[in-house]
């Protein structure tokens, strides 16, 4: 499931599995209907957390993508400076080697 992806954090591939498609649909629902209820942008990261979650579940699948997204959300707060934080192409669970 850890296919090579573009380095562009906004280049989001289409999820392949049904659980990943379901998770991606939940994120898109949040983006379309709930995110706009907040006043202005509140995310201190680039890409924003919902885009990160969408790419994480699309690239790594529902389970691993949810873990990555939860880890990202746990950084949300004044104790973390934020900044550029893209979805990793490979993680600790990957059996692929980076050359």
Swiss-Prot record:
Protein name: Putative membrane protein insertion efficiency factor
Record keyword Cell membrane present: yes
GO CC annotations, alphabetized: plasma membrane
Membrane topology qualifier: Peripheral membrane protein
Keyword annotations of the record: Cell membrane, Membrane
First-listed, main subcellular location of the protein, grouped into a coarse class: membrane
Protein family: Belongs to the UPF0161 family.
Function: Could be involved in insertion of integral membrane proteins into the membrane.
Species assigned in the record: Corynebacterium glutamicum (strain ATCC 13032 / DSM 20300 / JCM 1318 / BCRC 11384 / CCUG 27702 / LMG 3730 / NBRC 12168 / NCIMB 10025 / NRRL B-2784 / 534)
HAMAP family per the UniProt record, alphabetical: UPF0161_YidD
InterPro entries for the chain: Membr_insert_effic_factor_YidD
Cell compartment(s), UniProt: Cell membrane
């Amino acid at each position: 499931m850890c296919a090579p992806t573009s380095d562009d954090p906004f280049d989001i591939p289409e999820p392949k599995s049904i659980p990943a498609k379901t998770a991606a649909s939940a994120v898109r629902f949040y983006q379309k209907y709930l995110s706009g209820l907040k006043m202005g942008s509140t995310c201190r990261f680039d890409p924003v957390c919902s885009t990160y979650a969408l790419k994480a579940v699309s690239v790594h699948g529902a389970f691993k993508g949810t873990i990555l997204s939860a880890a990202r959300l746990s950084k949300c707060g004044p104790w973390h400076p934020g900044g550029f934080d893209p979805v990793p192409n490979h993680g600790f669970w990957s059996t692929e080697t980076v050359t």
